[in-house]
A protein has these predicted regions:
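Non-catalytic terminal/accessory segments
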Residues: 1-248
């Protein structure tokens, strides 16, 4: 409201988003937030306003997390990287997020290096499915393929370590089996390793900015149902669903 009153007020004293000539907008999630504007000078002024507002309440901005950047250079927020490329906004998993998931998968494979294949797959599926679910609405297809490949490399080392005296063909046939046209399916008779590439990318419909989740619950419930239906239809059309890859 503070920013709305300062940057979206008309000459008569009324404030409305249409009066926002400098395009100052706030997007917040928990204690993380971003503020956008049409130029750096306005953002510097906004920063002072925010600092004064927080100081009165005994708070202050984190110096290491606070930065002013151009949208063409990009910035990270909530695990995603936002950047404009040739006039088009691209939202992708951030580099930090990719490093974090890679490290977590590596630690999991290492921790279960002596465990049965079934248990390892269960633990990995919990990680990969959750991460793919979170990033399903952004440009993440190439990232999914990259993480899948890195995980394959980890699992190959895991398998070779367990059988150092066996040849590559024996190791491959022991842990990877053909299924639905895929020759390298890391699976057993009871469970299949989930591949992120099988997660359909489904964009989230833009919000009506005049809607409030506490006052317009029907709108948000309907919006959520529509998105879930789109995801369901997208998966039904996917190769994994049509070939019943995950059906045992």
């Amino acid at each position: 409201r503070l920013l709305l009153e300062r940057y979206s007020t008309s000459s008569t004293g009324h404030y409305h988003p249409n009066y926002n000539k400098h395009k100052v907008h706030l997007c917040r999630y928990a204690d993380d937030f971003i503020i956008t504007a049409d130029c750096k000078e306005v953002l510097e002024d906004v920063k002072q306003v925010v600092e004064e507002f927080m100081k009165e309440r005994g708070l202050k901005l984190s110096e290491e997390k606070t930065a002013t950047t151009n949208i063409n250079d990009g910035f990270d927020f909530l695990g995603w990287n936002f950047r404009k490329f040739e006039g088009k906004l691209l939202i992708q998993p951030s580099t930090k997020s990719k490093k974090k998931i890679t490290k977590k998968l590596s630690q999991t494979v290492r921790y279960y290096r002596e465990s049965k294949q079934e248990l390892l797959i269960v633990k990995l599926n919990q990680i990969t499915k959750g991460w793919a679910e979170y990033h399903h609405c952004v440009c993440a297809k190439s990232t999914f393929a990259l993480i899948d490949h890195r995980l394959w490399e980890m699992l190959w080392k895991w398998a070779k370590r367990r059988h150092p005296q066996k040849c590559n063909k024996w190791v491959k046939n022991r842990y990877w089996h053909p299924k639905c046209g895929r020759q390298w399916s890391f699976r057993t008779d009871t469970i299949v390793l989930y591949q992120m590439m099988d997660m359909p990318i489904v964009r989230v419909k833009s919000l009506y900015l005049n809607k409030n989740p506490f006052l317009n619950s029907d709108y948000f419930i309907k919006r959520k149902k529509e998105h879930e239906m789109k995801r369901k239809l997208a998966y039904q059309k996917s190769t994994a669903a049509r070939s019943e890859y995950y059906v045992l």
